């Protein structure tokens, strides 16, 4: 059974919400009796609203990918600090598998609950994951399209505010910061920027390594070896642009070494709606269901 439910304004057709996909199925409201054990669900409710629904689904035997942030952070104290709520189900926080196949593929396959990464963490972590455990300090400068701000209209995402402008926001206060730090195991300096495009995200990561500088060839080989078995991460030779991955589930990463100071710079691009949200959720659902990982994503 395929149900598509909405927390706000149900009883519309999907084609009226996203006409580009030509899907005429109607949005409904969630009814627990409509789900069966063994079903799969992807939950994209707002932060703090997703946790009760996810708990009900998991308790009924449904395997869930949670696209909200409600199960990403392992430290329970982080939820009131960064998201403004006390988590109602610490047991599910402890059980949830972080939904990054490039690191947790085998655990995702057997999970009851997968926490889909946030868009900024997805790009940042993929950019730095081959160096995890070797990073002394890192600065991440990230730029995202307007769709990353969600559907709720605010002054900052009006056309007249965004067009022909680039601006930083939530400096030293963005709630994706602890998620990046959790997965990389190092404190990060993270600054996000809003850019006047619909979809796409570029994270430029400047890292100093604990074991000293690497040669450019050694760095590229490190990345090529690490991502050789991961179908949606492409290691490229020149800094990629957002256009290369828009409307896809791919990430492109380009690692380079500063020949003067030895610092590693990694450019990482994703589609914030694709690999940064819905595409990643489908990739995780495929793994959980024992389907080909790239089914529906090529």
Model-predicted segments: where are they?
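C-terminal substrate-binding/catalytic lobe of Rossmann-fold NAD(P)-dependent oxidoreductases
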Residues: 2-6, 11-19, 32-34, 38, ...
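N-terminal Rossmann-like NAD(P) cofactor-binding subdomain of oxidoreductases
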Residues: 2-21, 27-169, 256-260, 295
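Residue-level signal for short, function-critical loop segments
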Residues: 119, 211, 272
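Secondary-structure boundary/capping motif
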Residues: 123, 215, 276-277
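Active-site catalytic microenvironments for nucleophilic, acid-base chemistry
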Residues: 130-134, 208, 284-291
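NAD(P)-dependent Rossmann-like dehydrogenase/reductase catalytic/cofactor-binding core
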Residues: 252, 257-298
């Amino acid at each position: 059974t395929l149900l598509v439910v909405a927390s706000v304004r149900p009883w519309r057709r999907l084609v009226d919400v996203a006409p580009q996909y030509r899907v005429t199925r109607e949005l409904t409201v969630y009814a627990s009796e409509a789900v069966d054990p063994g079903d799969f669900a992807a939950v994209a409710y707002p932060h703090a609203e997703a946790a009760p629904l996810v708990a009900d689904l998991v308790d009924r035997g449904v395997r869930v990918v949670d696209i909200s942030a409600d199960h990403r952070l392992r430290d329970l104290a982080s939820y009131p600090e960064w998201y403004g709520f006390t988590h109602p189900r610490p047991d599910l926080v402890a059980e949830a598998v972080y939904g990054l196949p490039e690191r947790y593929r085998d655990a995702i396959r057997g999970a009851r609950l997968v926490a889909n990464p946030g868009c900024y963490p997805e790009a940042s972590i993929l950019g730095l994951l081959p160096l995890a455990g070797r990073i002394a300090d890192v600065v991440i400068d990230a730029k995202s399209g307007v769709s990353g701000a969600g559907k709720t209209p605010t002054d900052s995402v009006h056309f007249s505010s965004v067009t022909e402008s680039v601006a930083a926001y939530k400096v030293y206060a963005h709630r994706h910061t602890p998620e990046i730090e959790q997965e990389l195991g190092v404190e990060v300096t993270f600054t996000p920027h809003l850019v006047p495009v619909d979809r796409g995200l570029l994270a430029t990561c400047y890292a100093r390594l604990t074991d000293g500088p690497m040669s450019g060839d050694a760095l590229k080989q490190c990345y090529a070896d690490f991502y050789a078995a991961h179908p949606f991460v492409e290691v490229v030779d020149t800094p990629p642009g957002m256009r290369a991955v828009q409307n896809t589930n791919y990430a492109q990463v380009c690692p380079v070494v500063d020949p003067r100071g030895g610092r590693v710079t990694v450019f990482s691009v994703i589609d914030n709606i694709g690999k940064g949200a819905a595409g990643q959720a489908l990739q995780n659902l495929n793994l959980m269901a024992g389907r080909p990982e790239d089914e529906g994503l090529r």
